[in-house]
Amino acid sequence: MGSSGDAWKLKDHPKLPKGKTVAVIVLDGWGEAKPNEFNAIHVAETPVMYSLKNGAPEKWRLIKAHGNAVGLPTEDDMGNSEVGHNALGAGRIFAQGAKLVDLALASGKIYEGEGFKYVKECFEKGTLHLIGLLSDGGVHSRLDQVQLLLKGAAKHGAKRIRVHALTDGRDVLDGSSVGFMETLENSLAQLREKGIDAQVASGGGRMYVTMDRYENDWDVVKRGWDAQVLGEAPHKFKDPVEAVKKLRQEPNANDQYLAPFVIVDDNGKPVAAILDGDAVVTFNFRADRMVMLAKALEYENFDKFDRVRVPKIRYAGMLQYHGELQLPSHYLVSPPEIARHSGEYLVRNGVRTFACSETVKFGHVTFFWNGNRSGYFNEKLEEYVEIPSDSGITFNVKPKMKALEIAERTRDAILSGKFDQVRVNLPNGDMVGHTGDIKATIEACKSADEAVKMILEAIEQVGGIYLVTADHGNAEDMVKRNKKGEPALDKNGNIQILTSHTCEPVPIAIGGPGLAPGVRFRQDLPTGGLANVAATFMNLHGSEAPSDYEPSLIEVVDN
């Protein structure tokens, strides 16, 4: 479809009026699961969300937020905020990073592209460094993809390979880092048997080393830079498996916050720093927690921390992590092309839009919502507000986060009369849920519920409409379960806390004084998912969705 005015024009909905203020509220990490002591949402007794579920059954339902419904390879793949907001904003299902990488590796096309050819130029004399999350969680990376990339790089000429492995414990169980490191070591040993000099060079926990996002805490990236590029870290080991085991024994240590370490040879020297003439590939397929490192690796004018030494390298991402910034400028697999998303359609049809969250999720209601695109479509019709997140802490310390501030700014935007749509992300359930602190997550859910209340009260005052949903599950089930669905126990008989997302469905609710009589959720879309939400809120704005969008979840029944 072209970009002329007529091509972007949305048809009027035959039964629903225009002119109502619509609030689209995304509760991050808020799925639906059986009520029990490990369901932080249930224990929190969230009265607003409870009333939406039980007050009008025809205006509340569950939708899918994982697997194929959000473009991921299998139904075992849990959703995440990136793909969730892509689907919410795009109104269609696009193959996402993990699936694109799978296809490129399976076909071998990854080795035929410009990105791989670019880094391959260093294979003869330099070292290939692979940096990323060592995990099978499938949210940011997958270990099997790394193993295939190692084999493929060796086959295509890499003679010296170093892996800088970040431990997970967030999308997978805490403590799983040891097994992942052992698996990686076995793969590297197989390469060594074939004459390839392949070793782990450094490591550290993802939330303490390298993988910050939205410029929340550059010290995280600096710790990674020091270990990976400079070969400097407070802990030195000869063996990476031993490194992880020993560092996990430190007080309050866990996989997410493992201290940075480097691997050294018999003389105590790092087995590899990143030097002039080397190649670097960041193998995460998810963008948000690679952008800051990509800037440090690629930008000549960089002032976020003292890099000390900036090697002349050839760098490529697994995908391009930021389309507007063209960052990185080289990448192995092209990211999904998402055009004609709902945000641009609404703006081109005169819908004045307000988007708000705090730093840790601000990019989700803007960049990811808008199809991996930064900036405004029309500054005269849009306003994006970022509330600075707390930095330097784990979010269970302050589980309320900035929910109140987000709600206040959104309330003010609604009452100002300047906007036709407000969309917000309330991060509490997800960000605090990732800490594994159930008590704090309960408080987080209460705070998010209170924020929803404030926004809905504003919608009530202006005679508007609300749509409340979530991007994926997390806080609703915070324990690992066995095949019988019972809480799983570790070797010491302790319950294994779950810090990852889930594959549970998420709620969606509609209502408000501006909702036309007879509007209800359809019964003929039992497998509806996040991609159906865009057409739904387009209808609430009084417009039909584009014909290729996933169908709206609502219908209007004449009374």
UniProtKB/Swiss-Prot annotation:
Source species, domain of life: Eukaryota
An example molecular function term from Gene Ontology annotations: manganese ion binding
Protein species of origin: Nicotiana tabacum (Common tobacco)
Function: Catalyzes the interconversion of 2-phosphoglycerate and 3-phosphoglycerate.
Cofactor field: Mn(2+)
Localization of this protein: Cytoplasm
The EC number(s) this enzyme carries: 5.4.2.12
Protein's UniProt name: 2,3-bisphosphoglycerate-independent phosphoglycerate mutase
The keyword Metal-binding appears for this protein: yes
UniProt cross-references to SUPFAM superfamilies, sorted A to Z: 2,3-Bisphosphoglycerate-independent phosphoglycerate mutase, substrate-binding domain (SSF64158), Alkaline phosphatase-like (SSF53649)
Broadest EC class assigned to this enzyme: isomerase
Positions that bind substrate: H140, R170, D171, R206, R213, R286, A287, D288, R289, K361
InterPro entries registered for this protein in UniProt: Alkaline_phosphatase_core_sf, BPG-indep_PGM_N, Metalloenzyme, PGAM_B_sf, Pgm_bpd_ind
Pathway terms, separated by semicolons: Carbohydrate degradation; glycolysis; pyruvate from D-glyceraldehyde 3-phosphate: step 3/5
Binding site for Mn(2+) 2: D28, S81, D471, H472
Any single Pfam family the record assigns to this protein: Metalloenzyme
Binding site for Mn(2+) 1: D430, H434, H501
